[in-house]
């Protein structure tokens, strides 16, 4: 298989039923050791040969096992390792394939079959050889926005690509699809078998061994509003009657509390008191932001619904009360932030996607992604035990 996100791969997955069914079946198809062997190509590319002619089901099972593991830690060195290892494997398969058929990869390309007669010689002179593939300019710029179109032959709204161009642009789509796949599984991670947590542990152990230090998950801490998703920023500005309760009590309360206290919870039934020791984190850091946003609503939420503050505490997991103690945590469910689909359905006015939204399915993973990218941008370029640059900078 050339691409685990291709139509061919999707057809194979359909044979298992739903994605949940496939994820349940994976532990019966591959072992943890099988899966971890796949990421070892990052350390030793000589291992790649064993993955080049793999059975399609085995290949998909190993790949999705890694994505399932990442659903518990969606942004960090683990993601970079999984991306890099699989790019090595699938890129090599593409390079060795005599003819890449458009339906075998996950980007929308066509075989280049027509050229204006007067352009053929010019194309050969300028580009060295006749391009083999074409794609829409809009799709091209979406994947490689910094590329100069002047470096490519353009005809009737399509960019013409040589084989090496195709593989390079495909790699950008592949990385994006990996993140999308992880975010999809993030929504069902509480339903996944324990197998995937074991895979994650082995990925983290490999990273620690390879890079000489332990990589932890993103922890709770001071909120970074500049990295909030658009829906949260819109809710903070205040909203009109009709979506006030959803925007403030459901969305903002859940997002701010998890983002500040437990941005990457180990499970969905976690309680506030499992994560903090002082309720003032809520009363002094989170609640004032919620109240300010509620007061910006039209009309202000608490003017005509003063008891809604009790509902906010209820959604934080303290039960329906106005003055809880930390020990009351667990009297109700600490609501997890709704996913993007639910936000669009209940409060479409809040959903104004930006360029980062294309990767995610939940506002909390948006925040995790932005924090991760900022950390990667500011990380010092330190060498690992073998004198290589850290993977984060490769």
Swiss-Prot record:
Entry keywords, A to Z: 4Fe-4S, DNA replication, Iron, Iron-sulfur, Metal-binding, Primosome
A cellular-component GO term for this protein: primosome complex
UniProt cofactor note: Binds 1 [4Fe-4S] cluster.
Gene3D superfamilies xrefs: 1.20.930.50, 3.30.200.260
InterPro entries named in the record: DNA_primase_lsu_euk/arc, DNA_primase_lsu_PriL
Gene Ontology terms describing biological process: DNA replication, synthesis of primer
Cofactor(s) the protein requires to work: [4Fe-4S] cluster
Chain positions recorded as [4Fe-4S] cluster binding sites: 231, 340, 351, 357
Signal sequence segment: none
GO molecular function: 4 iron, 4 sulfur cluster binding; DNA-directed RNA polymerase activity; metal ion binding
Similarity remark: Belongs to the eukaryotic-type primase large subunit family.
Cited NCBIfam families: PRK03968.1 (NF003051)
Complex formation: Heterodimer of a small subunit (PriS) and a large subunit (PriL).
Its biological purpose: Regulatory subunit of DNA primase, an RNA polymerase that catalyzes the synthesis of short RNA molecules used as primers for DNA polymerase during DNA replication. Stabilizes and modulates the activity of the small subunit, increasing the rate of DNA synthesis, and conferring RNA synthesis capability. The DNA polymerase activity may enable DNA primase to also catalyze primer extension after primer synthesis. May also play a role in DNA repair.
Name the record gives this protein: DNA primase large subunit PriL
Highest classification ranks of the organism: Archaea, Methanobacteriati, Methanobacteriota, Thermococci, Thermococcales
Chain's gene name: priL
């Amino acid at each position: 298989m050339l691409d685990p996100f291709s139509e061919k791969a999707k057809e194979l997955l359909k044979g298992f039923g739903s994605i949940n069914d496939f994820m349940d079946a994976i532990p019966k198809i591959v072992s943890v050791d099988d899966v971890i062997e796949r990421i070892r190509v990052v350390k030793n590319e000589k291992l790649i040969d064993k993955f080049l002619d793999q059975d399609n089901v085995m290949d998909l099972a190993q790949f999705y096992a890694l994505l399932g593991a990442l659903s518990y830690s969606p942004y960090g060195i683990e993601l970079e390792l999984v991306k890099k290892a699989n790019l090595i494997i699938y890129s090599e398969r593409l390079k060795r394939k005599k003819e890449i058929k458009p339906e075998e990869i996950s980007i929308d390309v066509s075989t280049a079959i027509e050229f204006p007669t007067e352009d053929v010689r010019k194309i050969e002179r300028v580009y060295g050889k006749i391009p083999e593939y074409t794609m829409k300019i809009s799709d091209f710029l979406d994947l490689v926005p910094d590329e100069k179109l002047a470096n490519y032959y353009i005809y009737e709204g399509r960019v013409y690509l040589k084989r090496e161009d195709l593989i390079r642009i495909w790699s950008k789509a592949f990385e994006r699809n990996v993140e999308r796949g992880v975010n999809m599984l993030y929504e069902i991670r509480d339903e996944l078998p324990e197998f995937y947590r074991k895979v994650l542990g082995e990925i983290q152990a490999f990273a620690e061994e390879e890079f000489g230090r332990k990589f932890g998950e993103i922890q709770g801490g001071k909120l970074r509003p500049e990295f909030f998703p658009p829906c949260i920023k819109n809710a903070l500005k205040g909203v009109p009657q009709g979506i006030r309760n959803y925007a403030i009590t459901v969305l903002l309360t859940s997002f701010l509390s998890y983002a500040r206290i437990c941005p990457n919870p180990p499970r969905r039934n976690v309680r506030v008191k499992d994560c903090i020791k002082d309720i003032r984190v809520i009363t002094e850091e989170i609640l004032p932001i919620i109240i300010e946003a509620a007061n910006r609503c039209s009309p202000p939420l608490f003017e005509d619904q003063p008891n809604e503050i009790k509902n906010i505490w209820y959604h934080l997991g303290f039960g329906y009360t106005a003055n809880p103690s930390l020990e009351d945590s667990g009297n109700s469910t600490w609501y997890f932030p709704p996913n993007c689909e639910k936000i669009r359905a209940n409060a479409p006015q809040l959903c104004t996607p930006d360029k980062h939204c294309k990767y995610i399915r939940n506002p909390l993973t948006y925040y995790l992604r932005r924090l991760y990218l900022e950390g990667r941008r500011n990380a010092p370029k330190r060498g690992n035990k073998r004198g290589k640059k850290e993977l984060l900078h490769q």
